[in-house]
């Protein structure tokens, strides 16, 4: 391992202890490396503004940071176990290439605000991807709701047949859910969009750092003012980001549950594209919906990441090394969550309903609610109408059709009035 940034002269570092301290940081930091480089460039510019670096030194640092980013992207530079973390790797490279200019880059900052700013930039990008994917999923659902508005589908409560519903209603429900998920992700971007660079280890420094410049240069909406809060916000912002992701993966879990049921032989309402299924290693007849099952499992990983960070935050104010573990939680949580969400738009666009199976699952009792409401409209007190309809449920469907039931469902949002124009307007607002 290269020289440790914090190592004191004459003090030997035990290899086992150092391995424990570093953990899997150097692997996780590959996620944050390019963001750390971008923040280092902005920090160097700020140092030049206050006279710590000359224009020549700034030019050399900026050039070498750009080269390091290019080498990392191409694979010419590998962030591996010879470095303690991404911060050490950047400083080692700059010192090797530039000498004292590289040794000056850390003036006025700590690895604490380095990882804070890199993480904030990373979280902004990941949350924007959650918002984009949620909007894509909502658009697929809106398009299919429009195209299949009148397709009868059995509606369930308690996983028991309940009323006549429609594919349009089913799709519209998921469209609105993922519009909300996109809004929540965008709102969370606004929360985390604050610049902690320049807060150092949580108490500021005796330098007039140009924090306004780094805020603008890195594209942050505002300055995170208090160095104390900068440390308090670590974990808190990660938790908020995972909650926004979890809102999307929670709905993903529920839609995957629907599809798990609907693709089973007992329902057979839906056929999945072949590429979303696998076979059995022993049963030649099997076509397993493994993709949607693993989608369903994804929320567990996101929830676990949330729980891990929540437990880490049982701490007093100030920096604590415990917080290092928050990196693994967000990397794993967002890694699993986004990978699953990426697959959902195409899956939803290509699934096929089986209208004959859907119609066969609509039985006479599913019209009983219609009968009760119609009697109430005619003047029968609803509770009496309810009792009468319950007693005659087995014959409630006589003379009725699924299409007739759907056409009568005129309450706003129901099958005859899906209000897709309202949802479309909300979807359009996401892109504004």
UniProtKB/Swiss-Prot annotation:
Q: What is its EC number?
A: 4.3.2.1
List the Gene Ontology MF annotations in alphabetical order: argininosuccinate lyase activity
| GO terms for biological process, alphabetical | arginine biosynthetic process via ornithine; L-arginine biosynthetic process
Q: Name where it's found.
A: Cytoplasm
Q: Which UniProt keywords apply?
A: Amino-acid biosynthesis, Arginine biosynthesis, Cytoplasm, Lyase
- Gene3D superfamilies in the record, alphabetically? Fumarase/aspartase (C-terminal domain) (1.10.40.30), Fumarase/aspartase (Central domain) (1.20.200.10), Fumarase/aspartase (N-terminal domain) (1.10.275.10)
The disulfide bridges present are none
A GO cellular component annotated for this chain's UniProt record is:
cytosol
What is the first-listed, main subcellular location in coarse terms? Answer: cytoplasm
The top EC class, named as a word, is lyase
Tell me which Pfam families the record gives. Lyase_1
Q: Which reaction does it catalyse?
A: 2-(N(omega)-L-arginino)succinate = fumarate + L-arginine
State which pathway it belongs to.
Amino-acid biosynthesis; L-arginine biosynthesis; L-arginine from L-ornithine and carbamoyl phosphate: step 3/3
InterPro entries in the record, alphabetically? Answer: Argininosuccinate_lyase, Fumarase/histidase_N, Fumarate_lyase_CS, Fumarate_lyase_fam, Fumarate_lyase_N, L-Aspartase-like
Please name the PANTHER family in this protein's record.
ARGININOSUCCINATE LYASE
List, alphabetically, the HAMAP family matched. Arg_succ_lyase
Q: Which family does it belong to?
A: Belongs to the lyase 1 family. Argininosuccinate lyase subfamily.
| The name this protein goes by in its record | Argininosuccinate lyase
